[in-house]
Amino acid sequence: MDNNYLNYYNVFEEFDAGAGIKEKELFTEEQQLSFLPKKGLGNGGFDGVERLYSNIINNNDIKSLLALIMLVFAINTNSLVALIFIILSAIFVPVPALIIAYCIALHLKNGSDATHVGISILLMLASAVTIYLTSTSKISKGFKRAIDVVLLVILGFYIVKIYGIDRQISIPSRRYCRQMSGPSSLENLNAFQTHSNY
């Protein structure tokens, strides 16, 4: 509640514990901060948007839901948008678990197409090793972020291989081959002349 009594009146500051001992002598500053509200919370310390954002970040179920929604969008979109959705969902859930879920979902979606299964298996194995290392040993945050970045780069390469550059190169070459194999303008002119004689 915004209009909490403790937001503007600290009971413990005027509490007399007996024998002249005040509250500040009973509790350290860290102990007070652990159970007393932050100063300025009721006087505009957080506005509605900041409080909503703070609640979303602190609740794991909401973070998982947002990541799941963005993962579904990533599976059903093209390469660049899929990569953006993957990076956004990596803010809310661990990157290795996200990569494993994306690779499995993409393989189930494109089950008959087995051209890029090797990269997918490599990504899932690297993600599983990363999960094992982070759960069994103490890895620094910097090293873990570096592993996450490497996994995301490999995933970006995988997504571009499936959706992006291969199709963009193959489509113009087919059109060019069709144009080259078609009848020339001289052949069209000769065909018109032969029909005009009749």
UniProtKB/Swiss-Prot annotation:
The modification Phosphotyrosine is found at residue 198. The record marks 18-19, 182-183 as: Cleavage. It holds the Pfam family Pox_P21. Residues 1-55, 167-198 are virion surface. The chain crosses the membrane at residues 56-76, 146-166. The 22 kDa precursor is probably cleaved by the I7 protease during virus maturation. Its main location: virion. It is a multi-pass membrane protein. Keywords: Disulfide bond, Membrane, Phosphoprotein, Transmembrane, Transmembrane helix, Viral envelope protein, Virion. Belongs to the chordopoxvirinae A17 family. Interacts (via N-terminus) with D13 scaffold; this interaction helps D13 to associate with membranes. Interacts with A14. Interacts with A27; this interaction allows A27 to be anchored in the mature virion (MV) membrane. Part of a complex composed of A17, A25, A26 and A27. Envelope protein which participates in virus morphogenesis. Needed for an early step in viral crescent membrane formation by interacting with D13 scaffold protein. Its interaction with D13 scaffold protein leads to the formation of rigid, crescent-shaped membranes that assemble around the cytoplasmic virus factory. Membrane anchor for the protein A27. A17-A27 virus envelope protein might be involved in fusion or attachment, and can further associate to A26. This is Virion membrane protein A17 precursor homolog.
